[in-house]
C-alpha cells in the first residue's frame, strides 16, 4: 500500500477535469473557497479544453492527469467534476508514472473508475470525496471537515450522519475491512475488464443518482449475479439522490430492493449513508481499513487507519 503525503493548509491543490468540463464561473467560485482557507490552486490544462461535453480528447485528459502527478509543485489533485468519459481515458494512463509520483487524488461519480483503477493498479490510496462541484451552490462544512480529517492523517474517524439524512440500518452486525466502492454504474461498467473491482473481504459502498427503481434493482441483481456481493464483509448504500418511479409504480423502495436481493447475506447493511451525489459527502480512503458497528447508532462507520503519511 502506498499512502500519499498529507495535505497541509499551505499545500498546492491541482485542479483537473478528467471527464466533463466545468463552467468557468463555477470553477472560479469554488476554487476561491479553498484559496480563502490558505491553499494554493493550480489549474490544469484540461479545465480550459472542450471536446463536446468532455474536457479535451481522451489523450488530452490523460496527459493532464500525468502532468498533475509529475508536477513537483502540486501536492494533491482534486477533480473539478465528474460526468462521463473515464472509460476512454483509463487505457491511456501510465500507472507506473502515477505509482512513482504518489499524491492525494480525490473525486467521485465518474471519477470512481479512476479511483478504483489507480488503487488496484498502483496500490496508491485514492479518495472518494468532494470535488469542486460539491460546492457549486454553497460551502458545506460537513464535507470539508471530514475531508480535512482524512487528508491530514487522522485515524479512528467516527462518521456521524447528519440528522436530516436519516441513515438507516437494514441489517445489524459488526465487521471491518478495506473500504472500496463508488458509483454503481461505474463499478458495473468495469466488470469484464482488467479494472474490475475485486470485492473479496472488503466493505463495499455504492451510490448513484437519477435512476429509476427498476434500473436500481437491475444493477443490484447484476452485481449479485456477478459475484460482487459474495465475499464482502459489509455493504454501505449511499444516498440514492433523485431516485424515480414510473407511472406504473414499482411497488418497492430502494431499501426493500436491497433486502430482497441481498437480505440473505450474513453482513451488516447500512443505507442512505452520506456518500455520493447528495449534499453531504464522506471522504472514503479507498483500500484503507474501515469498521462497521451498527450498535453505534449515531456513527456506525469508522475509518480506523490513517490514509496518508505525515512528513516530519
For the regions a language model picked out, list residue spans one by one.
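Internal helical hairpin/lid segments
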Residues: 198-254
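Short acidic/histidine-rich motifs immediately flanking catalytic phosphotransfer sites
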Residues: 71-76, 232
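Conserved anion/nucleotide-ligand pocket segment
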Residues: 123-186, 192
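Short, acidic/small-residue loops that bind anionic groups at enzyme active sites
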Residues: 95-117, 125-132, 265-268
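Conserved beta-alpha junction segments in alpha/beta enzyme cores
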Residues: 21-26, 33, 174, 178-209
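ATP/nucleoside-binding phosphotransfer catalytic cores, i.e., glycine-rich phosphate-binding loops
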Residues: 239-312
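ATP/NTP phosphate-donor binding region
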Residues: 1-73
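N-terminal glycine-rich "phosphate-gripper" loop used for MgATP/nucleotide binding
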Residues: 76-87, 108
Amino acid at each position: 500500500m502506498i499512502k500519499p503525503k498529507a495535505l497541509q493548509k499551505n499545500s498546492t491543490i491541482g485542479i483537473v477535469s478528467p471527464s466533463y468540463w466545468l463552467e468557468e464561473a463555477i470553477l472560479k467560485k469554488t476554487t476561491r473557497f479553498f484559496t480563502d482557507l490558505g491553499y494554493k490552486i493550480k489549474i490544469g490544462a484540461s479545465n480550459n479544453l472542450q471536446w463536446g461535453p468532455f474536457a479535451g480528447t481522451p489523450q488530452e485528459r490523460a496527459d493532464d492527469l500525468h502532468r498533475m502527478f509529475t508536477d513537483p509543485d502540486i501536492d494533491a489533485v482534486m477533480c473539478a467534476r465528474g460526468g462521463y468519459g473515464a472509460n476512454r481515458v483509463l487505457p491511456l494512463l501510465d500507472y507506473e508514472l502515477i505509482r512513482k509520483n504518489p499524491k492525494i487524488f480525490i473525486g467521485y461519480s465518474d471519477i470512481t473508475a479512476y479511483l478504483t483503477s489507480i488503487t488496484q493498479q498502483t496500490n496508491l490510496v485514492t479518495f472518494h470525496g468532494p470535488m469542486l462541484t460539491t460546492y457549486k451552490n454553497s460551502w458545506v462544512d460537513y464535507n470539508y471537515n471530514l475531508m480535512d480529517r482524512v487528508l491530514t492523517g487522522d485515524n479512528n474517524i467516527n462518521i456521524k450522519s447528519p440528522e436530516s439524512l436519516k441513515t438507516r440500518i437494514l441489517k445489524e452486525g459488526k465487521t471491518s475491512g478495506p473500504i472500496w466502492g463508488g458509483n454503481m454504474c461505474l463499478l458495473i461498467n468495469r466488470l469484464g475488464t482488467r479494472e474490475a473491482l475485486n470485492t473479496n473481504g472488503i466493505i463495499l459502498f455504492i451510490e448513484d443518482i437519477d435512476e429509476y427503481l427498476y434500473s436500481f434493482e437491475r444493477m443490484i441483481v447484476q452485481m449479485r449475479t456477478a459475484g460482487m456481493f459474495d465475499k464482502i464483509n459489509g455493504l454501505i448504500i449511499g444516498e440514492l439522490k433523485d431516485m424515480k418511479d414510473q407511472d406504473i409504480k414499482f411497488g418497492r423502495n430502494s431499501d426493500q430492493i436491497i433486502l430482497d436481493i441481498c437480505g440473505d447475506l450474513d453482513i451488516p447493511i447500512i443505507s442512505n449513508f452520506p456518500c455520493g451525489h447528495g449534499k453531504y459527502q464522506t471522504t472514503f480512503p479507498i483500500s484503507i481499513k474501515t469498521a462497521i458497528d451498527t450498535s453505534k447508532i449515531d456513527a456506525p462507520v469508522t475509518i480506523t487507519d490513517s490514509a496518508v503519511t505525515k512528513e516530519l
